[in-house]
């Protein structure tokens, strides 16, 4: 049943892979949740909307360009944002980074006063931009992003060092310059230095906190 009295503010956080988007989103969520409660704020990672690839072999999945907009099911994400804004709950997909496809289970996600969505390609899609009440681009030097990506993918996602570097050179870096960096022009706020920028986080927290009241 829809919550007709519900008003939902969508905040988008974009930027390069391993730029600090998730850290900013989780920091804002953690600190604001302590102030306004879990029912008023939530986070949706764009990664949840990687396309289901259960019909592909593992070899075919390895060859997919996961940094290209076509790898994302933005149509479903757009539909879910519209549902949440209408006061309806959604079934949030879950993605398996080891199997390179969606998990069978979903998470029941209820509408919130503020929903933070974060991901590399969010600002490349006009439909998604139009659903955002304001947007942020995390601007972190690519060499720092690469070091963070290596650490994350090897330690958390079961990747080999060689595979991470190969993917970075083949798709991550080229797609950044083709799609992600140009989408910076659509951001309302640009945050340098990623999640280490405490001043920016405090400013964003104050701004987003207004919508949680």
Curated annotation (Swiss-Prot):
The gene is udk. It comes from the Bacteria. One of its GO terms (cellular component) is cytoplasm. It is found in: Cytoplasm. GO terms for biological process: CTP salvage; UMP salvage. This is Uridine kinase. Belongs to the uridine kinase family. One of its GO terms (molecular function) is ATP binding. CDD domains: UMPK (cd02023). The keyword ATP-binding applies.
């Amino acid at each position: 049943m829809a919550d007709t009295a519900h008003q939902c503010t969508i905040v988008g956080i974009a930027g390069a892979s391993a730029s600090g988007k998730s850290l900013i989103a989780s920091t804002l969520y953690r600190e604001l949740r302590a102030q306004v409660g879990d029912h008023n704020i939530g986070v949706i990672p764009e990664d949840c909307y990687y396309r289901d690839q259960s019909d592909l072999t593992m070899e075919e999945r390895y060859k997919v360009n996961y940094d290209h907009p076509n790898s994302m099911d933005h149509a479903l994400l757009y539909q879910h944002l519209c549902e949440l804004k209408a006061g309806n709950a959604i079934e949030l997909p879950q993605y398996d980074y080891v199997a390179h496809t969606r998990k069978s289970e979903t998470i029941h996600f209820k509408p919130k006063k503020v929903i933070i969505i974060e991901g590399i390609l969010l600002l490349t899609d006009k439909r998604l931009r139009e659903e955002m009440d304001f947007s942020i681009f995390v601007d972190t030097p690519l060499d720092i992003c690469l070091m963070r990506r290596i650490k994350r993918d090897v330690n958390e996602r079961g990747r080999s060092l060689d595979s991470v570097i190969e993917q970075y050179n083949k798709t991550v870096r080229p797609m950044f310059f083709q799609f992600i960096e140009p989408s910076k022009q659509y951001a309302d706020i640009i945050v340098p230095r990623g999640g280490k920028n405490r001043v920016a986080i405090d400013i964003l927290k104050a701004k987003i906190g207004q919508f949680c009241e």
